[in-house]
Curated annotation (Swiss-Prot):
Organism: Aspergillus niger (strain ATCC MYA-4892 / CBS 513.88 / FGSC A1513)
Any one Pfam family match given in the protein's UniProt record, by short name: Nop16
Name by which UniProt lists this protein: Nucleolar protein 16
Gene behind this protein: nop16
Region (Disordered): 1-23, 214-239
Tagged with keyword Chloroplast: no
Length: 239
């Protein structure tokens, strides 16, 4: 007979105890070893967060588009500017807004066919007449704060000498590893392949055509050229 207490446990909606998996955080996400690189480990500050450390080292901790905000710190010259993220891809709406900026232009047409011959664009500070008043093209409302706008001001990103040096070290390390990966490594024959080549040579000598037709010693139907290359490599390793 089934124990009543055990039957209630089976019907209970409470989660069962699971074995703790190593390598996971409390949130269930995989634990990432941020100190896997020796250069980053040497310059890591354990008193700072991951975002602060990566910003100080000149790295990006997240490849997605930036969202939210961060506190701006005051400096001697004003408020420090954050470096622009080179991996951020601007949305199509921003690009479309720049392309479709409204402006007045003059068009020169052919008097006979009516085709457009030339498009004359006025300067930004050119005066145009709107409602009987002459105003500047880039400031039709005569806004006194328009000249103080920061559209033409380019904020200089914060220069971090130590961060730039670390980035250069990481780039050199990545370049060296890339060269070693791209380098062609010679293939070494295994012991079983050497024994197989030895049996072929003992039976057929230099007759590569007979080796290719031998169904017992060559069940995978290797071609004459492939067998010749394997035997040449075997002889070079023995010499």
């Amino acid at each position: 007979m089934v124990n009543i207490r055990q039957a209630k446990k089976k019907r209970s909606s409470l989660p069962k105890a699971k074995a703790k998996r190593s390598g996971l955080l409390k949130s269930g996400k995989k634990k990432i070893n941020v100190l896997g690189n020796a250069i980053i480990a040497e310059n890591w500050d354990r008193k700072q967060t991951l975002t602060q450390n990566y910003r100080r080292l000149g790295l990006v901790h997240r490849l997605n588009a930036p969202s939210g905000g961060s506190q701006k710190r005051a400096t001697v010259n004003g408020i420090e500017g954050e470096p622009e993220d080179s991996l951020y891809i601007k949305s199509s709406t921003e690009a479309l807004a720049k392309q479709t900026a409204t402006s007045d232009i003059k068009v020169e047409r052919d008097p006979e066919t009516g085709k457009i011959l030339r498009v004359i664009r006025g300067a930004a500070d050119e005066e145009v007449e709107i409602a009987g008043r002459k105003v500047k093209r880039n400031n039709p409302l005569n806004d006194p704060l328009n000249d103080l706008s920061n559209h033409g001001i380019v904020t200089q990103p914060r220069q971090n000498a130590s961060g730039n040096a670390i980035v250069e070290q990481l780039e050199r390390q990545a370049a060296q590893e890339g060269v070693s990966v791209r380098a062609k490594k010679p293939r070494h024959q295994s012991q079983r392949e050497e024994e197989w080549v030895t049996r072929l040579i003992e039976k057929h000598g230099d007759n590569y055509a007979a080796m290719a037709r031998d169904r017992r010693l060559n069940p995978m139907q290797q071609t004459e050229g492939d067998l010749k290359r394997r035997i040449r490599k075997f002889q070079q390793s023995r010499s």
